[in-house]
Amino acid sequence: MNVINFIYSIFDKKLFKCGTISSRGLFYNDLNFFHFEIYFLLALITFLIFFVILSNKKNYRSYYYLNVGGIFSNLLPFVVILLLIILNTNTNDSYYLFAGFYYNDAAVVFFKNIILIGFLIFTFAIKQYLSYFKYYDFEFILVLFISLFSSLLILNSNDLISLFFIIELQSLTFYILVASKQTSSFSTESGLKYFILGCFSSGIILFGISLIYGFTGLLSYTDLTLFLSEVYVTNFILDSSFFSFSGFLIGFLLLTVGFLFKLGSAPFHMWMPDVYEGSPLLITAYLSTLPKISLIFVIFKLYYYVFFEVFLFSQGLFTLTALFSILLGSIAAIYQVKLKRMLTYSMITNTGYLLLGLSFGDISGIYITIFYLISYIFIMIGLFFCFLSLRDRSSGLLVKRINLFSNLLEVNPSLSFSIFILLFSIAGIPPLLGFYSKFFLFLFSLKYKMYWMTILFVIFSVVSVFYYIRLVKLMYFNRTTGWIFLYDIPFLNSLIISFITIINCLFFFNPNLLFKLIYNFSFYLYI
């Protein structure tokens, strides 16, 4: 017996649950399943070594030429593009690894593609942010890269414990990013608030997982699915022989509350306004878009697959939090005078629409939620790119108050038009992209006979249009005596803003392309 076979014989063969793994040995073909993760980690380690050895030496002659912002912002797009290429080499593989801890299929690859494409767009905003503020510390970039890795790894989780650990890794990076603006005490305060309340929500999730494990003895998604299908009988009546099922339901509801807290839905939104206002605008843009993709995927996996037999208990909670989020977000945003607080309440409103789609409980819910999620992220990235391009003339800082948008039409008509289109799109004005997402959401609500809820959602959707129109009114009809914005927008940022604006305007010519793509991947999550 050679050395490789001897080492392989030591391992329990249950470690590899998938039958597609080669029997020749641990070191022959098994690493083929981890090309994406290996390349990601190698890139992370390479950047870390380079920054620690060279970039952090301030007495080194070329430190000011080889700054972190310049080097990383130029290399990062190529790294992400290579990640996309490696990710899509084996898109049809479906397999379990490490006793079911790790899972991959076409739906996971689809969501990873969305996150990576979104992050690729963000790399150009990162370049502008670092170069303008002369931010040379490598920790910011490193933590941002780790947060991306954790967001991608969440999608492969197939066990409640591994899911919790990865969510905690992601949360730790978020705490650091929120408090990354060292010159601002407000940023430090926001990071501390986020840390305390984030730990509280993590404790709720962990307590729910412990109750689920205590009353079932299971943590694997696959095992829990089989177990619940056995104790559940027809007509939505629980098997009375499972005497401790009530304790399981408490854990299930605690897990649901923890995820709603992470999503920032009302009434679990208390942390969002202060945290998002205190964090740098780039981090606010990042936290409000890409991490939501991984959380929504986890909710799909848990509530449409693992806990589908008891989905009825969370369906009402999803509907109520959706209504409360839309109500609170629509009304509270009207009274905001600060840009980031207004956007935060807009995010809470859109989270309510996402939860409404999740409450449907079938493939239609998956389809409309994914479509709304992609539309929302696409529009919000465009809006944040516009806002990151605006700086106050007197202070040179990014715009904080909405009254500073006065007279923007005279300063930059093209940017004013882009903001106008994107605001109307997220408000749901036809025939823009955002209109289709809300239209199908309300259409499916009527299909499931949620008549009163649909009426309320439409009313508050109209109310939310007010604060978007108010911003447009400031740009187009308010006049000021001075020029507020006199800073050039980088070419790549202008290109991205123009592209997103054009797609929003031209989407209605051929919407079936995106519809069919999302509908096909919805089956992977539902079947």
Curated annotation (Swiss-Prot):
Please list every transmembrane segment annotated in the UniProt record, as residue ranges. 33-53, 66-86, 106-126, 135-155, 160-180, 195-215, 241-261, 281-303, 317-337, 347-367, 368-388, 415-435, 452-472, 489-509
What is this enzyme's catalytic activity, as reactions? a ubiquinone + NADH + 5 H(+)(in) = a ubiquinol + NAD(+) + 4 H(+)(out)
Pfam assignment, any one:
Proton_antipo_M
Q: Which UniProt keywords apply?
A: Electron transport, Membrane, Mitochondrion, Mitochondrion inner membrane, NAD, Respiratory chain, Translocase, Transmembrane, Transmembrane helix, Transport, Ubiquinone
Membrane topology classification: Multi-pass membrane protein
Give compartment(s): Mitochondrion inner membrane
Secretion signal, residue range per the UniProt entry: none
Q: What is its EC number?
A: 7.1.1.2
Give the enzyme's main class according to its UniProt record, as a single word: translocase
**Major subcellular site:** mitochondrion
Name the InterPro entries on file. NADH-Q_OxRdtase_suN/2, ND/Mrp_TM
Q: Which domain of life is it from?
A: Eukaryota
Question: What NCBIfam families does the record tag this protein with?
Answer: NDH_I_N
Its annotated function is as follows: Core subunit of the mitochondrial membrane respiratory chain NADH dehydrogenase (Complex I) that is believed to belong to the minimal assembly required for catalysis. Complex I functions in the transfer of electrons from NADH to the respiratory chain. The immediate electron acceptor for the enzyme is believed to be ubiquinone.
The record's HAMAP family line, in alphabetical order, gives: NDH1_NuoN_1
What protein does this entry describe? NADH-ubiquinone oxidoreductase chain 2
